[in-house]
Amino acid sequence: MAEEVSNKQVILKNYVTGYPKESDMEIKNVTIKLKVPEGSNDVVVKNLYLSCDPYMRSRMRKIEGSYVESFAPGSPITGYGVAKVLESGDPKFQKGDLVWGMTGWEEYSIITPTQTLFKIHDKDVPLSYYTGILGMPGMTAYAGFHEVCSPKKGETVFVSAASGAVGQLVGQFAKMLGCYVVGSAGSKEKVDLLKSKFGFDEAFNYKEEQDLSAALKRYFPDGIDIYFENVGGKMLDAVLVNMKLYGRIAVCGMISQYNLEQTEGVHNLFCLITKRIRMEGFLVFDYYHLYPKYLEMVIPQIKAGKVVYVEDVAHGLESAPTALVGLFSGRNIGKQVVMVSRE
């Protein structure tokens, strides 16, 4: 007889308009049998860490034709996480394995591993890193910068939302290559972090700049070669007029637009023509084949202290709604993680 245990879950109550609130979610207690369904290749896991990511906002509304499905109101939220395998119907995973990938916002989940699920081999680093630098955000930074932007030593690089899960890594990867790097963030604390901890050459608080284009001109008098786009809206407009000829823009996210019922337009797209700019959107899913190569590069750098990563860890599943909502007001410092259990 399979063990049946209590399972705390974070439920989305209804689809969300405007900025999400803690009250859009609720904590619910159910029971779960820690048993793989007969004849399936599912994996039963105990969730250890959950990742709060900006893309999750789009899943809180009814969407069609996107790269991800909407969350189902009345059901647990899903997202990237780190978990321990309790039972497996898939020969690739064994009881006791540590994994990262898509899981439920709950204490225990039954996962179909056809979804992205990676076995964790290197445990000499904090397990929570597999929600960030060694997980989806890390691969996003690596693929977006190295594969989409084709950077060269000595180029000028601008990163928006630069202290977040992805931005802090893009800046460090650019510095490792020998680029001049500037980041923008939304508080003095974050700006200081960019320069003192992550090694950005310069950084500024976009909230204190009345003219974003003038601010960029101040830091990039000769223009920007590469822009890693996380924000959209007014920042993108300001960047376009400050790009160099043949500049590259990797479009990773547009967090300034996610909570608007009417998204803002972009006025300076003509610069794409006059400056021969290449602007490319990308999704990390298309680059997971490079994950082993990425780990080979980044794990030694982490262990040598050459790449650093800042996390903002919330404790307990009950804290997850507040942690997720905080992303959209910039409350988090670094990568937002929820620790569900230590094991």
Swiss-Prot record:
Task: List UniProt keywords, sorted A-Z.
Answer: NADP, Oxidoreductase
Q: Which reaction does it catalyse?
A: an n-alkanal + NADP(+) = an alk-2-enal + NADPH + H(+)
Q: Which organism is it from?
A: Nicotiana tabacum (Common tobacco)
Q: Which CDD domains does this entry report, sorted A to Z?
A: double_bond_reductase_like
Q: What class of enzyme is it?
A: oxidoreductase
State how it assembles: Homodimer.
Protein name according to UniProt: 2-alkenal reductase (NADP(+)-dependent)
Task: Summarize the pH-dependence annotation from the UniProt entry.
Answer: Optimum pH is 5.4 with 1-nitrocyclohexene as substrate.
